[in-house]
Amino acid sequence: MPSPKRTFLDRELAHLVKHAYANAPAVKRIFDDAGVKPTEIKRVADLARVPVTPKDRLIQMQRESPPFGGFLAADPQRLKHIYLSPGPLFEPQGADRALDQVAAEIFRIAGFKRGEIALNTLSYHLSPGGWLLEGGLQRAGVCVVPGGVGNTELQVRTRSE
């Protein structure tokens, strides 16, 4: 019998696949070209049947159909951020902050405590790294000083004060 966590993951995955197929033209095209129906993806184990899109192909698709290559399965007006990661790849971020919760749990396990102050030196420039750390730290109750990269002497002085 599957664990409650596995049952939850399977159910969420099946929902996500059906949603992406119905709302993201590129996902529908990839599934159809491979002869895979979204209803066939019911469990995490079924992911092996999902066609993989290589990074080079994804970049090409984003150039042909900017900015997301037909992979956006949400209303563009509901996006919170658009990141540009190395590749270059455009990455949308909606209002869902599930990654913040995951990052917060990791920070708690690492020993961060509510009320502490953290200097975030990851870049906030176009990539999601700085924002992901900030969201997780804030969710864990930590106050964030958004340092980013550069200004090393000022950041060292800020840290020591």
Q: How would you name each of these model-derived features?
A:
Residues 74-77, 98-102, 125-129, 147-151:
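Short secondary-structure boundary/capping elements
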Residues 19, 122, 147:
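Small/polar loops that bind or transfer phosphate-bearing groups
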Residues 109-144:
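Conserved AMP-binding loop of ANL adenylate-forming enzymes
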